[in-house]
Amino acid sequence: MQFSTFQKNLDNWQGASLIFGVLEEEIASQLENIKFIVDPKLLLKKVTQKKFKGEKGETLSFEFLDQKLETLIIVGLGKSKYLNKSDIENSIGNLIRKTVDKNEKISILLPWELINSQLEINQLAESARLSAYKDNRFNKKKDEKKVLKEIEFLNFKSFENICFEEAEKICEGVELARRLVAAPPNSLTPQEMSMQASQIAKDHGLEVKILEAKECEDLGMGAYLAVAKGSDLDPKFIHLTLKSEGPIKEKIAIVGKGLTFDSGGYNLKVGASQIEMMKYDMGGSAAVLGAAKALGAIKPKGLEIHFIVAACENMINGSAVHPGDVVKASNGKTIEINNTDAEGRLTLADALTYASDLKPDSIIDLATLTGAIVVALGNDVAGFWSNNDDLANDLKAASAQAGEELWRMPLQKAYKEGLKSHIADMKNTGPRAGGSITAALFLEEFFDTEIKWAHIDIAGTCWTDKNKGINPSGATGFGVKTLVQWIKNK
C-alpha cells in the first residue's frame, strides 16, 4: 500500500471514495472545501435534513452516479477546542476499516490547519494504513474483495513537500509484528522466528547471530534453557545488530520476550488463562523484530542498536522443568522455580545478562509478562518500569507521539522481600499482590545497574478481540511505533 497527495487544481480531481472531516462548528463554511465535487448549498441542505452536527464520530454517506466521485463520507470531528490527534486518527481509522473492502483507493480531506507538523501528517498516514490492515494468510478461500492499494491526501496547504517514505517503513515494521503475533504456534516456531530475523538482516544490512542450544549452554544460560528443554523444538537465541556508519554516540540494546507458545509447563494453564491464545506470548519479540525492520530501513545516525530475542516454547515433556527446580542464570544467580508458568522472566534473565555484557548505554525490554498488569491498567495502556527518570521521560514522550500509551509503574524495593528463597538466591515469582512489580524487580537482578533500563509489560496491549481505534481485531503490533519514535528522537 502506498500514500499519495493531490495538491493541484481540485476541479481536475476524481476518485472512488472520499472521507471528508468536518468540525462541529461552522459546517456551512467547511462544505465550501468540497465545492469541486458538489454544490455546497445543496449538500448543506441534505446535511441539515439528516440532522448531522459534526459531533465526534458522527458519519454521513452520500452516493454519486457521476464520474468524479462514487462515495462521499462526511465524518464529524467534534469541537476544535477539544480535538486531538488521536481523535482524528481513530475517526479516520474506523471509516477506512468500513470501506476497505470496497475500494482500491481511498482519498482523505481534513481541516489541515489543525495538523501541527509533518510528523503528525506522517502519523495520520500510518494510522490510516494500519487501520486497513488485513491478514488472510491462513484462510482456505482467499478474500475476493478489493484490496486497498492507495491512500490519497487532498489539498495540503502547509505541507507541500511531504514525504511518506518513513511512514511506510514504520507501517511495514508494525505489520510484521502483527503477522508474527497472529501466526499460529505450529507456523511461528523458534526456528521460523530466527529465519524472520535473518531475513530482516539480509534485507536491511544488519548483522545477525543465531545461537544454538549448545552455544547458549556454553554461555551458562541455565534459566533460558530450563524453559526450552520441555519442548521438542530447539531454542534459538537471536541477536541482530544495526550499526550506523560514522561515529557512534550511543549504544542501545532492545530485548523481547520470545515464547512462541506457552502452555504454562507443569503449572499448566487452565480455565480463564486462555491457553489457546498463548501464541501471542512472543508479542515482545515481535515488537523488537518489527522495530528492527523499520529502523533497518530508516537507518538512524550515530547509533549502535542490538535487538535480542531468546526464542523457545514452554511445553511439557519428560525433560521439562519441575516446580521446585533450582537453575543458574548466566550471571551466576540461582533461581528457585516455584511456578513454571512464570517462564518469560527466566528467558529474559539470560537475555538481559547477554545484553548487559554488550555494555550498552541503555536497555529496553518488552514482554507479555504478567496478567497482573492487565488487571491494573486494562487493554489500552502498557505499564513500564525504569531505573532512570530521563529514560522514563523520553519513553513516555515517544509513546505519546506514537499514539501508544504507557504508564510508569513503581519499582517498589520493599516488594523484593517476596522473591526471597530459602534454597536459592531468589524465586521466580512473589506473592499475588503486586505481581507485575515483583516481575520487574526480578528482571532488575540481571543487568549492570549502572545501565539505564526500562521494562515494558505489553500483556494487555499486544492483542485486541475487537476493532479498536487504528487496530483491527487481532494482533496490534504494540511497541514498534514507540521504539522507533524513541530512537528517532535521539
Curated annotation (Swiss-Prot):
Please state where this protein is localized.
Cytoplasm
Protein's UniProt keywords contain Protease: yes
- Detail which positions bind Mn(2+) 2: 257, 262, 281, 343
Query: Tell me, what is one Gene Ontology molecular-function annotation carried by this entry?
Result: manganese ion binding
Enumerate the Pfam families for this protein.
Peptidase_M17, Peptidase_M17_N
* Cofactor detail note: Binds 2 manganese ions per subunit.
Record keywords = Aminopeptidase, Cytoplasm, Hydrolase, Manganese, Metal-binding, Protease
Q: What is its main location?
A: cytoplasm
Name one cellular component (GO) term. Answer: cytoplasm
Q: Does the keyword Hydrolase apply?
A: yes
Residues annotated as catalytic: 269, 345
Look up the record and name the cofactor or cofactors this protein needs: Mn(2+)
Q: Check the UniProt entry and state the signal peptide residues, or none.
A: none
Tell me which residues bind Mn(2+) 1.
262, 341, 343
Q: Which GO terms describe its biological process?
A: proteolysis
Tell me what reaction this enzyme catalyses.
Release of an N-terminal amino acid, Xaa-|-Yaa-, in which Xaa is preferably Leu, but may be other amino acids including Pro although not Arg or Lys, and Yaa may be Pro. Amino acid amides and methyl esters are also readily hydrolyzed, but rates on arylamides are exceedingly low; Release of an N-terminal amino acid, preferentially leucine, but not glutamic or aspartic acids
EC number(s) stated in the UniProt entry for this protein: 3.4.11.1, 3.4.11.10
Q: Which InterPro entries match?
A: Leucine_aapep/pepB, Macro_dom-like, Peptidase_M17_C, Peptidase_M17_leu_NH2_pept, Peptidase_M17_N
Per its UniProt entry, what is the enzyme's top EC class, as one word? hydrolase
Q: Which family does it belong to?
A: Belongs to the peptidase M17 family.
Q: What does this protein do?
A: Presumably involved in the processing and regular turnover of intracellular proteins. Catalyzes the removal of unsubstituted N-terminal amino acids from various peptides.
Which HAMAP family does the entry mention? Cytosol_peptidase_M17
Under what name is this protein listed?
Answer: Probable cytosol aminopeptidase
Source organism of this protein record: Prochlorococcus marinus (strain MIT 9312)
Gene name, Swiss-Prot/TrEMBL = pepA
